[in-house]
A protein has these predicted regions:
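Membrane helix-loop-helix hairpins that form the core translocation module of multi-pass transporters
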Residues: 35-104, 164-170
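Residue-level signature of catalytic and energy-coupling elements of molecular machines
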Residues: 21, 82, 130
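Selected transmembrane alpha-helices and immediately adjacent juxtamembrane segments
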Residues: 90-91, 98-133, 139
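Alpha-helical transmembrane segments of multi-pass membrane proteins
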Residues: 13-17, 47, 80-88, 122-126, ...
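Physicochemical signature of membrane-embedded alpha-helices that form the seven-helix bundle of GPCRs
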Residues: 13, 73-76, 110
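Juxtamembrane transmembrane-helix termini in multi-pass membrane transport proteins
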Residues: 2-69, 134-157
Length: 170
């Protein structure tokens, strides 16, 4: 298997899983105040760390040689990916709590990270446990020898899908 096949699989899986996701809404909100290149760099950097972690973790789990363990782990990963997709369509309950909590961004404002750093941190935190994160974990399980191609495909899929959100925000 050449390096292009895992790249294409990773790109297409992440791209389509990201469409309409909360990360796109986050990027849409960033696009009102930041330049597109800063947002895309932040998305690429955040994706590198979050999805890279998922792919590396998945490929490490794939190194366990017990076949039934791998089967159930893949089954759990793909089932949870589908479950997260279904949960995304369910309506949320309205929040009746009126107390104001400090925003996520105000906690990091003293670090002076700049726009790219704030976007990257937002993407990292937003993607942990997300369906695209689980998809990356599953890709790492399925193709443990092609980590570089999977990470590059994941970054390309996230950047391209969020580029659509930037165009909508401008």
């Amino acid at each position: 298997m050449n390096l292009l096949y895992p790249f294409i699989i990773s790109f297409s899986m992440i791209f389509f899983a990201e469409l309409g996701d909360k990360t796109q809404l986050l990027v849409l909100s960033f696009s009102t105040k930041n330049k597109a290149y800063k947002i895309l760099l932040g998305v690429a950097l955040g994706t590198f760390f979050s999805h890279g972690l998922a792919i590396l973790f998945g490929s490490k789990l794939a190194s366990f040689s017990h076949i039934s363990f791998q089967f159930y782990l893949k089954l759990f990963t793909y089932f949870s990916f589908i479950l997260f997709g279904i949960i995304g369509f369910l309506p949320e309950k309205p929040n009746t709590n009126t107390t104001k909590k400090p925003s996520f961004f105000s906690r990091f404002s003293h670090l002076h990270l700049g726009a790219i750093g704030m976007i990257a941190i937002s993407i990292i935190v937003g993607e942990l446990g997300d369906k695209t994160f689980l998809a990356s974990l599953g890709l790492g399980l399925e193709y443990p020898l092609y980590k570089f191609s999977l990470i590059c495909g994941s970054i390309a899929g996230m950047v391209l899908s969020n580029l659509l959100a930037i165009f909508c925000g401008k």
